[in-house]
């Protein structure tokens, strides 16, 4: 019988994780299948315990479940996930433990490195203060970036900045409201959108327009559906370098794949699969 893996979230119909992971399982000759499951926050406890009872191999968690997972007393988060305050990967261990990890930050870091973007010393604006933003902020602070988190609710941005600062990482960080975004972008080296603005089906929304961007900027949108979000289109008009959310999706997925199986994931194949699905 095939071993089942999956992604829990709401909404989750847009997810390309099933195509990506199923291509990897197939290429490696593994008798496994990966599905997307719509799960609301109030049902997360039952859903994860149900998956364990049915012998699932592992799970990914996406919006809005990453932070909710840490509230569950049966999940054993690793130190990084606990520090970030969000779990995106669940492993059902042979000892019976349900372990929580966060691979989002590593995925974002690898995406920037593949695009030949210098992180250390760069001035980075992170838009959003949710689970993905926390992962990105902790990772880039560890890599020595100077980060400003901007969020519609300023208190959440400030709280995130305080959490990262308390970890005594090499980078610097502060938080502010969205009203300061335009001014911050003038001096920024990297803009990372971790909000859902621009995600299908609301593809005409964006955190910033071409007039607010500049050619010395790298614009990284973690939204990957559509492949070219409105933010990335605006960035191209401004002459900025762009980094697709596909890369973060692939590299966080590759990290999760290895945690579940102990096997190196075929990342290039996974990227090819995602790009083909988005361009279909």
Curated annotation (Swiss-Prot):
Query: What is the annotated quaternary arrangement, including any partners?
Result: Homodimer.
The job of this chain, per UniProt, is described as: Involved in the biosynthesis of the chorismate, which leads to the biosynthesis of aromatic amino acids. Catalyzes the reversible NADPH linked reduction of 3-dehydroshikimate (DHSA) to yield shikimate (SA).
The catalytic activity of this protein is classed by the Enzyme Commission as: 1.1.1.25
Q: Where does NADP(+) bind?
A: 128-132, 151-156, 222, 245
HAMAP family annotated for this entry? Shikimate_DH_AroE
One of the GO BP terms on file? shikimate metabolic process
Which organism was this protein described from? Methanosarcina acetivorans (strain ATCC 35395 / DSM 2834 / JCM 12185 / C2A)
Q: Which family does it belong to?
A: Belongs to the shikimate dehydrogenase family.
**What pathway does the annotation place this protein in?**
Metabolic intermediate biosynthesis; chorismate biosynthesis; chorismate from D-erythrose 4-phosphate and phosphoenolpyruvate: step 4/7
Q: What is this protein called?
A: Shikimate dehydrogenase (NADP(+))
Where do the catalytic residues lie? 66
One GO molecular-function entry: NADP binding
Q: Where are the bilayer-spanning segments?
A: none
Q: Does the keyword Transcription regulation apply?
A: no
Q: Which reaction does it catalyse?
A: shikimate + NADP(+) = 3-dehydroshikimate + NADPH + H(+)
- Residues at which shikimate binds: 15-17, 62, 88, 104, 224
**Keywords of this entry:** Amino-acid biosynthesis, Aromatic amino acid biosynthesis, NADP, Oxidoreductase
Q: Which PANTHER family match?
A: BIFUNCTIONAL 3-DEHYDROQUINATE DEHYDRATASE_SHIKIMATE DEHYDROGENASE, CHLOROPLASTIC, SHIKIMATE DEHYDROGENASE
């Amino acid at each position: 019988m095939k071993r089942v893996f999956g992604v829990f979230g709401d909404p989750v119909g847009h997810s390309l994780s099933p195509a990506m992971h199923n291509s990897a399982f197939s290429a490696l000759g593994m008798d496994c299948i990966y599905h997307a499951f719509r799960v609301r926050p109030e049902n997360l406890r039952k859903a994860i315990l149900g998956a364990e009872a049915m012998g699932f191999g592992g799970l990914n968690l996406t919006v809005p479940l990453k932070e909710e997972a840490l509230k569950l007393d049966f999940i054993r988060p690793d130190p990084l996930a606990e520090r970030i305050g969000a779990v995106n990967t669940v492993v059902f261990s042979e000892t019976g433990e349900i372990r929580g990890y966060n691979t989002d930050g590593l995925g974002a870091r690898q995406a920037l490195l593949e695009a030949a973007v210098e992180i250390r010393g760069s001035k980075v604006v992170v838009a959003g203060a949710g689970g993905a933003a926390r992962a990105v902020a902790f990772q880039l602070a560890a890599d020595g970036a100077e980060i400003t988190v901007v969020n519609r609710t300023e208190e959440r941005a400030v709280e995130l900045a305080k959490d990262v600062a308390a970890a005594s990482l090499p980078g610097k960080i502060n938080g502010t409201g969205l009203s300061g975004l335009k001014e911050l972008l003038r001096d920024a080296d990297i803009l990372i959108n971790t909000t859902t603005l621009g995600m299908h089906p609301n593809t005409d929304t964006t955190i910033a327009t071409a007039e607010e961007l500049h050619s010395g900027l790298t614009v990284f949108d973690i939204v990957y559906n559509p492949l070219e979000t409105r933010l990335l289109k605006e960035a191209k008009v401004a002459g900025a370098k762009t980094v697709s959310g596909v890369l973060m999706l692939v590299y966080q997925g590759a990290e999760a794949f290895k945690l579940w199986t102990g096997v190196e994931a075929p990342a290039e194949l996974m990227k090819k699969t995602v790009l083909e699905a988005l361009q279909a």
